[in-house]
Amino acid sequence: MPHSSSGAPLDPVAFIHSQIRTVPDWPQPGVMFRDITTLLQSPKALRILVDLFVERYVDAKLDYVAGLDARGFIIAPIVAYELSVGFVPIRKVGKLPYKTRSESYDLEYGSATVEIHEDACRPGDRVIIMDDLIATGGTMMAGRNLLQRLGAEVVEGAAIIDLPDLGGSALLRNAGLPVYTVTEFAGH
């Protein structure tokens, strides 16, 4: 467990929260960007973060951890490795070399598409889907839909950060996907 400068133990979730940098007005005015690179640069913070996810899923009898392009690729393979399960990448369109299934979803301005290899998992496989952050929930919902089309059971959506004011975690839960996030930030 991390300790404060006085030597007192810190709550792991509070410690993770404290390691995330906020960058105002990036990538556009009015946005408060939650930057996980500072968390990833700290070996102690990264270990605590991975341990939180592993503790949550160690008894979930998973077959795979799916990660969403691009920042979901950072944490999901580490968690998969620690759980001794496979990693499934869900990528932006045109990035996977083999036969794929695709799913489009709406963004605030426009739309996007993600893809998965058609043989990434089998019917009945138990999967969690991970990303760094849940904002509107569109990417995670599209990833969940892809996994379900392959017959997988999507056990839960997981992320480091929730931005509840943007409604994504509520949207996912209302659609029947349980959601776990380590911490949350108010606002955008």
Curated annotation (Swiss-Prot):
Group of enzyme by EC:
transferase
Q: Does this entry carry the keyword Transferase?
A: yes
Name the Enzyme Commission number(s) assigned to this protein. 2.4.2.7
Q: In which pathway does it act?
A: Purine metabolism; AMP biosynthesis via salvage pathway; AMP from adenine: step 1/1
What Gene Ontology terms describe where this protein resides (cellular component)? cytosol
Cystine links in this protein are: none
Q: What is the protein's major site of localization?
A: cytoplasm
UniProt KW Glycosyltransferase keyword: yes
Q: State its location(s).
A: Cytoplasm
Its recorded reaction(s) are:
AMP + diphosphate = 5-phospho-alpha-D-ribose 1-diphosphate + adenine
Could you list this entry's UniProt keywords, alphabetically sorted. Cytoplasm, Glycosyltransferase, Purine salvage, Transferase
| GO MF annotation list | adenine phosphoribosyltransferase activity
Stretches of the chain forming a coiled coil according to its record: none
In terms of Gene3D superfamilies, this protein maps to: 3.40.50.2020
Q: Which Gene Ontology biological process is one annotated for this entry?
A: adenine salvage
Function comment: Catalyzes a salvage reaction resulting in the formation of AMP, that is energically less costly than de novo synthesis.
Assembly and interaction partners: Homodimer.
Concerning its family, UniProt says:
Belongs to the purine/pyrimidine phosphoribosyltransferase family.
Q: What is this protein called?
A: Adenine phosphoribosyltransferase
Organism expressing this protein natively = Burkholderia lata (strain ATCC 17760 / DSM 23089 / LMG 22485 / NCIMB 9086 / R18194 / 383)
